[in-house]
Amino acid sequence: MLKTSNLISSLLHNNLKNTSILRNKSIFYYSTNSNNNNNNNNNNNNNNNNNKNINLQNIKGTYDLFPNEQRIHKFIFDVGRGVAERYGFKEISTPIIEPFELFNRSVGESSDIVMKEMFKFKDYSNESSSPPSMICLRPEGTAGVIRAIINQSSTNHLTPAQRYYYQGPMFRYERPQRGRQRQFHQLGVELIGDQHPRSDVEIIDMAMNFIERLGINKSDTLLKINSLGDTDSIKVYNETLKRFYNDNVNKLSPISIKRLERGNSLRILDSKERQDIELNKLAPSIQDSLSIQCKDRFNNVLKGLDCLGISYEIDKSLVRGLDYYRHTIFEIQIIDNNQNNKGQRQQQQQQQGLAILGGGRYDGLANQLGYKYKEILPSIGWASGIERMVLFLDQSKIPNSIRPIGIAITDSSLSENAFKLCSNLRRNGWSSTLSTFNLEDENLSKQLKKFKNNPSFVIILAPSEYSNNTVIIKNMDDTTQSIIPLNEIDNFLENNKVLKN
């Protein structure tokens, strides 16, 4: 690659017209359109005006997480991490960028995600690939975890079963709305290598445990569950549905007519179009297409839920939106039990039936993506969207972030001592901060004013006290003050239940 200075020099020397130069054959481009020197001069003169018109707003469907929002997200992730590790799961992390074909094969080329919601682009980094291969921003986490396992499966035959959890951003080109963004965050779990019905029960139990530990009442949620059966059962049901929808094609929405033409009738059951919802009430039940073995398996899952006292509702229309699901599928939905506040009731009715967590079994997905060590690799998992979960949390019960300890002085001669004390406190595990680095130019009242809404305590260094190796500690909540020896600061903070970082 040419050095930047040589590149610019070459462009200027040759006065290239309408040139677009690819940098590293990747995403970054340098372009110029130099018709004559007058145009260049005009462009230079207009630089200031152009800068005034620059719009650097967030990209639609994305948002910034400031400290309070981070606090809420961190709470959800921390609860999820704690629950996952109590069930023996370990954290895994996969790239945000993945091959497009990974999701085309796993999620399904006829799915809404692949057809309408993927952020995909050409990968020019592989010069041997012609035409360039397609890569994408991941729309969900399961396929990436399976891909990672396949990549290292030559030394790991997944015995015993593997348990992973993950968290991070996902991307879908959807219409942004409350609780749904184009960049969103998920927490998910995957149990890979066990096909016993009790593994389904454990995964669902884990999901319910997660919801409860977030502080969401059981009475406000509904577990919906269904079985799609195995691959043969799904083929039989898909043909049954196809006949039903062909007989009622005039009642389908335009988008579902296209789904029918593509041959995936199951997607119509997942439609949110009003006319499709009405027609789906009359659709054949998948239970009639299940083999005896699939029915027995599903009944064993339900018995396991009964054993653990987990309430559920069998929803025969539940199919989930991804092609890789087999056998058990489930969702945890928010239901409206608030009959007191009319405004809250109206808002909750709009969110009635909104899924805050969903998952299911995806036996054979790994084999579909290249896993060779078992005929069918059994797997099951779930994922929860964090942005949607936030809507239903009682944020007053979420722990506050650690409040730092403030350091202030009454005399400029103590500024170096304050700086050193702040550093020592941090090394001892305390969160601490100065009101300003320019302590010499601020009186005590200005310093305390800056600390008003954050630190729980402020340590004040004053000449008379400091000469006796003591400091003043001010409680910013009740304004009381104490004089404490320097070597007793740690004990004082611990006794007052100040949290370490």
From Swiss-Prot:
Cleavable signal peptide: none
Gene3D superfamilies for this protein: Anticodon-binding domain, Bira Bifunctional Protein, Domain 2
Reactions that this protein is recorded to catalyse: tRNA(His) + L-histidine + ATP = L-histidyl-tRNA(His) + AMP + diphosphate + H(+)
Superkingdom of source: Eukaryota
Extent of Low complexity compositional bias: 33-54
Pfam families with a match to the protein in the record: HGTP_anticodon (PF03129), tRNA-synt_His (PF13393)
GO cellular component: mitochondrial matrix
The UniProt record lists the keyword DNA-binding: no
Region (Disordered): 32-54
Uppermost EC category: ligase
Protein name: Probable histidine--tRNA ligase, mitochondrial
Organism this protein belongs to: Dictyostelium discoideum
Upper lineage: Eukaryota, Amoebozoa, Evosea, Eumycetozoa, Dictyostelia
